[in-house]
């Protein structure tokens, strides 16, 4: 069996590295009865050591209790559990509930921010929020209007709040946050509004801004060292971003940071991805558009970037690079390596050395991916590290006002933000995917602050010549770059996965099923239809010696935007309304937490 180790899961790491991470987070991460981060641990593995529910008995799961959030539209993320309190969040208006598990989920406190509803039409792809984080006795929430709030975990009282962006300029938030040491790290949304996007660190106790690093712009705004920050093993050089944009286009260049963050306490580096360049019309922005579509490794104290890797230079398809970075220590080619595995929207599964940024593996995790033949990993090649684009599917080469047809994947990617999971018992990654292709027609657009800056019309449909569905749930070998097994889904698998020590992997489906599969074989062991489509992430916790599994249901997100927002034009929702029109025959709006456990006997 391959030697595989997890980061930030055990108490031993906390003891070994007391100065390199937040002690309260490490304590919570080391206790599988709780969940203090949306990602389960700093390494983003979404793996639980709980094994009371296992492959033999998961078929006996029953609904233990439910809770209505009182809010409709897309429910992403998951609850947190700290001690006997469960913390539940909602999409806009981002209500937070504290539920006492010792008292039948009694509401202990409720926080309901007063946000201007004008932020709703500025949010891309539904009014979702990917959840809370816990650190140092505080619940951290990044609201839709970009207000970052620290709440007292016991009372719900506001400790402090700070505004991270300006919705009138198109800046909003849908993401969770990452507490690291004495800081909290947050991103920003707005790539469809021409926002120059960034990552920001705030002081955990006061909310004071410590540093801000942009994805695009001059070196001082990027927080890079032209001689020490590297890409593919070489210094990036002076003005590495500016040289790849025409004139001042970088000022409206996007590269937003609305995905997930991970952190390696040993290397003292945080990892995340930057999103698409603005506009979606590639003809309007010549050049590689650095550093959009990029994996970043930064020091959390200073923001200084150690290395960057751009996955999709001069993006022509909206293949946002924001998906999670999963950190593992594994043997690669016989040597122990600190690895980073990333399943990108562009359809390639990447394995990198997270210390150096070296790309070790880049393979398609859906065989229908056709926009590029491969990623060139020949270090002697002029195109080293770049995808080799197929001309037929190049919206740049085909030109403005030309409909490029049959591009796979669609803009929402082979996987969007819905997070994968990793099991150290199998050494496999469990990935909820989209099996969707598109037609893409770019057109010229003018930038106006606070107005959509998209410049493309899309239509989406199931991948042709396949099983007819729009998704798969797969197991992936990140060392070989191969699919080990694949389960077809009727719609995109839009719920985040959870792997457990009980040899069970959980995930949710757009039509509302919670599913449990065998981690080794993929065999379906259990499913239950919840009241609405699942785009949330499955979580597990232990209360009074009993393991529970919980998931939020509430259809929405990009794939479910037609239902969530009541849209009927097939081209609306950037093409998703037509692509997922059949979803309305299987589910409807909702907002519910469903909690499962085994029978008492």
UniProtKB/Swiss-Prot annotation:
Binding site for La(3+): 192, 276, 318, 320
Predominant cellular place of this UniProt entry's protein: periplasm
Annotated signal sequence range: 1-21
Cofactor info, note text: Exhibits enzymatic activity only in the presence of lanthanide ions. Is inactive when binding Ca(2+) ions in the absence of La(3+). Binds one lanthanide ion per subunit.
Reactions the enzyme catalyzes: 2 Fe(III)-[cytochrome cL] + methanol = 2 Fe(II)-[cytochrome cL] + formaldehyde + 2 H(+)
Protein localization: Periplasm
Cofactor or coenzyme needed: La(3+); Nd(3+); pyrroloquinoline quinone
Gene Ontology MF, one: oxidoreductase activity, acting on CH-OH group of donors
Function: Catalyzes the oxidation of methanol to formaldehyde, but only in the presence of lanthanides (Ln). Contributes to methanol metabolism when La(3+) is present in the natural environment of the bacterium, allowing bacterial growth with methanol as carbon and energy source. Thereby is an essential enzyme for Ln-dependent methylotrophy. Uses a specific cytochrome cL (XoxG), encoded by the adjacent gene in the locus, as electron acceptor. Also plays a role in the transcriptional regulation of the mxa and xox1 operons, most likely acting as a lanthanide sensory module.
Identification of the protein by name: Lanthanide-dependent methanol dehydrogenase
Gene this chain is encoded by: xoxF1
């Amino acid at each position: 069996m391959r030697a595989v180790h997890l980061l930030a899961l055990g108490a031993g790491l906390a003891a070994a590295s007391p100065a390199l991470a937040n002690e309260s987070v490490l304590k919570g991460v080391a206790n599988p009865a709780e969940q203090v981060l949306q990602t389960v641990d700093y390494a983003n593995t979404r793996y639980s050591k709980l094994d009371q529910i296992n492959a033999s008995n998961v078929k006996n799961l029953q609904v233990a209790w439910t809770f209505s959030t009182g809010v409709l539209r897309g429910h992403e993320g998951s609850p947190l559990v700290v001690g006997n309190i469960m913390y539940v969040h909602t999409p806009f208006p981002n209500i937070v509930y504290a539920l006492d598990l010792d008292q039948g989920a009694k509401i202990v406190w409720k926080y309901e921010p007063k946000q201007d509803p004008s932020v709703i039409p500025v949010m891309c792809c539904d009014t979702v929020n990917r959840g809370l984080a816990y650190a140092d006795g505080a619940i951290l929430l990044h609201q839709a209007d970009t207000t970052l709030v620290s709440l007292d975990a016991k009372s719900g009282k506001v400790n402090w709040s700070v505004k991270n962006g300006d919705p009138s300029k198109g800046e909003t938030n849908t993401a969770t946050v990452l507490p690291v040491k004495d800081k909290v790290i947050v991103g920003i949304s707005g790539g469809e509004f021409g926002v120059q996007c960034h990552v920001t660190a705030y002081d955990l106790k006061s909310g004071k801004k410590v540093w801000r690093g942009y994805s695009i712009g001059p070196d001082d705004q990027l927080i890079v060292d032209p001689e020490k920050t590297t890409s593919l093993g070489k210094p990036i050089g002076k003005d590495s971003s500016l040289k790849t944009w025409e004139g001042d286009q970088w000022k409206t260049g996007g590269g937003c940071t609305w995905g997930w963050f991970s952190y390696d306490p040993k290397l003292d580096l945080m990892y995340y991805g930057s999103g698409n360049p603005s506009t979606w019309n590639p003809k309007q922005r010549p050049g590689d558009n650095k550093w959009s579509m990029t994996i970043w490794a930064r020091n959390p104290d200073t923001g200084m970037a150690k290395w960057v890797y751009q996955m999709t230079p001069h993006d022509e398809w909206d293949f946002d690079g924001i998906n999670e970075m999963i950190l593992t220590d594994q043997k690669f080619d016989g040597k122990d390596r600190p690895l980073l595995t990333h399943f990108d929207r562009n359809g390639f599964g990447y394995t990198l050395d997270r210390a150096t940024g070296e790309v070790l593996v880049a393979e398609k995790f859906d065989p229908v991916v056709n926009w590029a033949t491969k990623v060139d990993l020949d270090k002697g090649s002029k195109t080293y590290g770049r995808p080799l684009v197929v001309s037929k599917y190049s919206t740049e080469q085909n030109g403005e006002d030309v409909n490029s047809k049959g591009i796979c994947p669609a803009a929402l990617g082979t996987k969007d933000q819905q997070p994968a999971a990793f099991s150290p018992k199998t050494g496999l990654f469990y990935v909820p995917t989209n099996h969707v292709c598109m037609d893409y027609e770019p057109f010229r657009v003018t930038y106006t602050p606070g107005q959509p800056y998209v410049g493309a019309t899309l239509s989406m449909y199931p991948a042709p010549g396949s099983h007819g569905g729009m998704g798969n749930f797969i197991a992936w070998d990140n060392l070989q770059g191969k699919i080990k097994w694949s389960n077809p889904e009727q719609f995109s698998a839009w719920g985040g996965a959870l792997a457990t020590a009980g040899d069970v992997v959980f995930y949710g489906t757009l039509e509302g099923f919670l599913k449990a599969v065998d981690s080794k074989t993929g065999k379906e062991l259990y499913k239950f239809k919840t009241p609405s489509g699942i785009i949330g992430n499955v979580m597990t916790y232990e209360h009074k010696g009993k393991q529970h599994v919980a998931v939020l249901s509430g259809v929405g997100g990009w794939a479910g935007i037609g239902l969530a927002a009541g849209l009927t034009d097939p081209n609306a929702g950037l093409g998703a309304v037509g692509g997922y029109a059949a979803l309305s025959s299987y589910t409807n709006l909702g907002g519910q937490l469903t909690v499962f456990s085994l029978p008492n006997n």
